[in-house]
Each structure stands twice: as structure tokens, then as C-alpha cells.
Design a protein with these regions (language model features):
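Terminal amphipathic alpha-helical/low-complexity segments used for targeting or macromolecular assembly
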Residues: 1-47, 107, 169-172
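Short-chain dehydrogenase/reductase
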Residues: 49, 129, 147, 163-165
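Flexible, glycine/small-residue-enriched loop-and-beta-strand segment within the central core
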Residues: 54-64, 69-141, 167-168, 174-175
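Beta-rich strand-turn-strand
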Residues: 131-157
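C-terminal end-helix/capping segment
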Residues: 154, 158-175
Length: 175
């Protein structure tokens, strides 16, 4: 995991600006406000649908493939550095209240006093379905065609063509 300080002035200003764009979109998810959200991202494919309640911290390290759908109240704790990038492939379905969390803090209380964040990327390959309320933690890769059960907490990589569920998420079956 790569450290960064989210409390420096530049990053605070960027988060404030991104937060305002998200707030405007969530208040009125019009095409104009959706365009502003998509412009935050490093990449946003054709036919992407994002429902209201979307929140990200920075947006500049988020890439979304074609025809992916993000349901209501998705929280993306992204980082402003490439080590905290989020990649969502083509044809993905992200359920309501899903959290994608690339950012974490030190477990050691003395180290935590430094106020540093740590980031690791999240990669969601093509045709993945993430069920409602699932939490995907930093450093996780989810393979093509996989299904993440509702309410799951994904702490480790998920192989392609696999169904996982639970806290922590465990393999249920292969597809």
C-alpha cells in the first residue's frame, strides 16, 4: 500500500471540489450533472449509467468501461495517486449501497498519528455483478464474470467465473 497525506491543502481543495460536483449530481441527476461526474474520471466508457447517491473523493483515478451500471448510493473512497486507482470493466453491475474502498489507515496507533492514508488499487474485470451492500477493500481484483453476494466483504482477490459471499467473502461455487 502506498502512503499519501489526504490533509494537505491541495487534496482538501480537490476533495471539496469533487464533493460539490457529487452533491449537485445527487441533488439533480440530470444529463448535465452526470456529464460533470463522468468528467471527473480518468476514463468513462459509452453507455455508463450512474444513479443518484454516488460519492467519490477525487475521481481522477477511476476508470469505467462501456455499459456498466452503478446503482444508488455507491461510495467510492478513491485516492489521488495511481496506487489507489479503481478500474471497473465493461458490462458490470454494481448494486445499491456498494462501497469500493482503496484507502485505509495504519493499524498501529502511533503510526496513525501521522494522519497518513494508504492506498491500493481495486480492479473489477468485465461482466462482474456486485450485489447490494457489498464492500470491496483495497488491493482486491475481481475476475471476469464473477458474482459478489449481497452484503459481502471482499478482502482477497476473486478468480474469474466465481461466486463469493459472506464476511469475509468466500467462494460459494464456480460458474
Amino acid at each position: 500500500m502506498q502512503p499519501f497525506n489526504s490533509l494537505n491543502k491541495e487534496l482538501l481543495a480537490l476533495r471539496k471540489q469533487t464533493g460539490e460536483i457529487c452533491r449537485l449530481f445527487n441533488k439533480s441527476p440530470s444529463k448535465g450533472n452526470l456529464k460533470r461526474i463522468k468528467e471527473l474520471f480518468a476514463q468513462c466508457g459509452e453507455g455508463v449509467i450512474i444513479e443518484s447517491g454516488f460519492h467519490c473523493d477525487y475521481g481522477n483515478q477511476i476508470a469505467i468501461g462501456d455499459r456498466s451500471f452503478i446503482n444508488i448510493n455507491c461510495t467510492v473512497l478513491d485516492a489521488p495517486i495511481s496506487e489507489g486507482a479503481i478500474s471497473i470493466g465493461d458490462d458490470c453491475l454494481i448494486g445499491p449501497n456498494v462501497q469500493l474502498l482503496t484507502v485505509s489507515h495504519a493499524v498501529n496507533p502511533t503510526q496513525r498519528l501521522n494522519k497518513e492514508n494508504f492506498a491500493a488499487p481495486i480492479t473489477i474485470d468485465n461482466n462482474v455483478w456486485i450485489g447490494a451492500g457489498a464492500i470491496i477493500l483495497a488491493g482486491v481484483c475481481i475476475g471476469d464474470n464473477s458474482v459478489i453476494g449481497a452484503g459481502s466483504v471482499v478482502t482477497k482477490n476473486v478468480e474469474a467465473d466465481t461466486v463469493v459471499a459472506g464476511n469475509p467473502a468466500r467462494e460459494i461455487r464456480t460458474l
